[in-house]
Amino acid sequence: MADKRIRSDSSAAAVQAMKNAAVDTIDPPSHAGLEKKAEPFWHDNIRSKALDSWTPADLLAAVELANNQLYITVLRKDLRKEERIRGEERDEGLIKDLRKQIVELQRTILAQRRDLQIHSHATNGESRDQKKRNQNDRDARNTKNEHQDQDDNLIAFPKHG
């Protein structure tokens, strides 16, 4: 049976949010095949919701999402390069194909984001609870960032997740 969820307005949720802020992100599963250049997309996606909300299956899907986000930037770069060509060297068939691939990949990315619930009711419960958990996470990160460089800082921050 699944563990009972912590109330988003509890002190335990605030403590978990501070732990999440100290860790900042989650490393991708080594067996999932995240492209090196897709790491910025990975970290942005992972930070989109509370770190303790990610399941192992979500992390695998997040790798696919990050790789697709990288791939769409490559396709857009190729499209811009082809669109700059003038005259007989311009390949309209390739341009049309690239545009089609971009649209299809955008749809895939949107579906993956919905599935991951960078809004998922199935993994994270009611959306009102997820909204509060995400707010707790943002508040904890802001507090950490405001106070971490102060020499006379009296706020205790966890050093390890």
Curated annotation (Swiss-Prot):
Annotated coiled-coil positions are 88-115
> What keyword terms does UniProt attach to this protein?
Coiled coil, DNA-binding, Viral genome packaging, Viral release from host cell
User: Annotated region Helix-turn-helix (HTH): where?
Assistant: 37-60
Residues reported in the UniProt entry to bind DNA: K96, K100, R107, R114, R128
Role played: The terminase small subunit binds to the packaging initiation site and regulates the ATPase activity of the terminase large subunit. The terminase lies at a unique vertex of the procapsid and is composed of two subunits, a small terminase subunit involved in viral DNA recognition (packaging sequence), and a large terminase subunit possessing endonucleolytic and ATPase activities. Both terminase subunits heterooligomerize and are docked on the portal protein to form the packaging machine. Packaging initiates by TerS recognizing the packaging sequence in the viral DNA.
Q: How does it assemble?
A: Homononamer; forms a ring-like structure through which genomic DNA is translocated into the capsid. Interacts with the terminase small subunit; the active complex is composed of a pentamer ring of terminase large subunits and a nonamer ring of terminase small subunits. Binds a specific sequence on the viral genome. DNA transits through the central tunnel formed by the small subunit and sequence-specific recognition for packaging initiation and termination takes place as it emerges.
Q: What is known of its domains?
A: Contains a helix-turn-helix (HTH) doamin that is involved in viral DNA binding.
Q: Which family does it belong to?
A: Belongs to the Hendrixvirinae small terminase family.
**Protein name, entry field:** Terminase, small subunit
Identify the species of origin: Enterobacteria phage HK97 (Bacteriophage HK97)
Q: What is the lineage of its organism?
A: Viruses, Duplodnaviria, Heunggongvirae, Uroviricota, Caudoviricetes
Q: What gene does this protein come from?
A: 1
